């Protein structure tokens, strides 16, 4: 087994949450290792990157969690960009949510935070929007990060420059527990060899695959299919967030179109005709002109979902094993605050009252009652 010290951290999972947590520890002089089976399959590489606390219609503790994280993100991204030398595409571009009638608008959980848009206003904000949309809400403070092309690469580089050790192709077969304390993991490497890697403390952040590592974690995959189209630069300046489809414009005119919600897909890979057709119908319903723009890519991924669609963050009942998973649709939005709270928790640093309340609300124990 490999040697370890009290300032060593083992991260199980190399997706966005794992990288975010690894980054904050490495930046504070910890020796960090990341175990990842296939990092490019993580949700962080396939998500649209929206920062949509208000436009998602989040409620209660999820809304507060999103608000807190959105406040942290500018400084967090600034540090990542400085350490990596890679610009991450953070844009407070605003998000428009369209409605067909006022009844639906008034039922929207966060409508009081948005600016009301008449149909004329909608057409001004979203050039070419379908005339079926009569009203809208503009959430000007919501925005996006270009996670797929920039943020993930920037985090990987920043982690590497801070000494993080990556073990790609490392599939965790089992956790090694002694006297209810984690001391390591049994890992099948890319060449088929079974090794034991020990640790002082570990953080499990394996997204949709978390249950395969620790069965008591009730996380399941919800597949999402996406595609991108190339529009004219600056044609779409706001994100357009419809009821079943969203259009996320990057600064070069590329538009991310998402996403299907396939609850019974398990880990079935690949795009399907039905999935692509659903996305195309969504484009047509929101921005008909975009149906004539060239399609660039299509891909899929697996959101880590819990029974109540809220993340699991905090201590496990195994000493020195911490959990950060189940972020479902909001991994990009929640990454900054998750990494911050986990760092404080692992270090026994003081937490604010609202951080303590988040840990209570998002504890694994809520599923054991």
Outline where the language-model segments fall:
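C-terminal catalytic lobe of FAD-dependent flavoproteins
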Residues: 293-369
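Glycine-rich FAD pyrophosphate-binding loop
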Residues: 26-45
